[in-house]
């Protein structure tokens, strides 16, 4: 049996993960990652990151009779997640901080520390499945509960990471997880879920930008698809592709943010139909098998955490980028978001959606 470090948020998913591993005979230790100080300017704690999360995780570990620790990752979280989040918006991109947190904190810093401390594996409460094929290679699959599936956020995991990770609840539905936790008397069985970015729990990232990067909020022109100025914006980081509200353009046909042009400090707007894209480019691709399936292949592509996966052809370009050609157009494909490639329920890999002008 393995010596497993379980990343615990205090919620029902990671709590049950720890319980299941313990019941399977593993040696289990719980850990909560401390990501910032409560009084850090501009940042508010939410369910997944507050001091109450550590207290909840500690109670679960006490009930299970396993050790519990808190690891401090404030500096890493600031550099790799919050600074990245702000930098992306100031460059006209729509960031995905959860993907970066998984990539840099949970599945790099925590895995490295676990190895140093002598743990065989790290487990989390993510809804995804790891399957070892007949060839010995590790595969990443969607969770059984497709509504809770988090494989999109885990596409950056390769063989080195998957070989040392365990996702104990990926084979269960959320309802089953709650029932199993309640049956074991876990205090987190009925704990409310957090739906927001952990450092922006009210959902309004603009307040964070106003505090952390006020110099980036430079007013500029709003232009239509013909290049005519039809209004003024309050700073590009305050807008995202697909946004309609808050443009201040008055009546008439509804207009949406179609593109963001940092070079001209311009916000480009157009009708809803202009949001549809059938082709885009992906940069910095990574692959679960550590190599792409081919230079050109067909698959399903998902461009947002809860978007419908669409059939597409993906082809490598001479500069190393990947051209994605969708079978039918997708609405609001946002530069800066992850595009994740699937073969059925299996994750192949993914990368970051580039701006149209570099496609």
From Swiss-Prot:
Disulfide bonds: 101-198
GO terms for cellular component: cytoplasm
InterPro entries: MnmA-like, MnmA-like_C, MnmA-like_central, MnmA-like_central_sf, Rossmann-like_a/b/a_fold
Name under which the protein is recorded: tRNA-specific 2-thiouridylase MnmA
CDD domains, per database record: MnmA_TRMU-like
Keywords: ATP-binding, Cytoplasm, Disulfide bond, Nucleotide-binding, RNA-binding, Transferase, tRNA processing, tRNA-binding
E.C. no: 2.8.1.13
Source taxonomy: Bacteria, Bacillati, Chloroflexota, Chloroflexia, Chloroflexales
Active site, UniProt feature: 101, 198
The keyword Chloroplast is assigned to this record: no
Function as written in the Swiss-Prot or TrEMBL entry: Catalyzes the 2-thiolation of uridine at the wobble position (U34) of tRNA, leading to the formation of s(2)U34.
SUPFAM superfamilies: Adenine nucleotide alpha hydrolases-like
Residues given in the record as ATP binding sites: 7-14, 33, 125
GO terms of molecular function: ATP binding; tRNA binding; tRNA-uridine 2-sulfurtransferase activity
Catalysis: reaction(s): S-sulfanyl-L-cysteinyl-[protein] + uridine(34) in tRNA + AH2 + ATP = 2-thiouridine(34) in tRNA + L-cysteinyl-[protein] + A + AMP + diphosphate + H(+)
Naturally occurring in which organism (per UniProt): Chloroflexus aurantiacus (strain ATCC 29366 / DSM 635 / J-10-fl)
Site feature location: Interaction with tRNA: 126, 337
UniProt-annotated stretches for the region Interaction with tRNA: 148-150
GO BP term (any one): tRNA wobble position uridine thiolation
Residues that span the membrane, as ranges: none
EC primary class: transferase
Compartments in which it is found: Cytoplasm
Family as reported in the entry's similarity comment: Belongs to the MnmA/TRMU family.
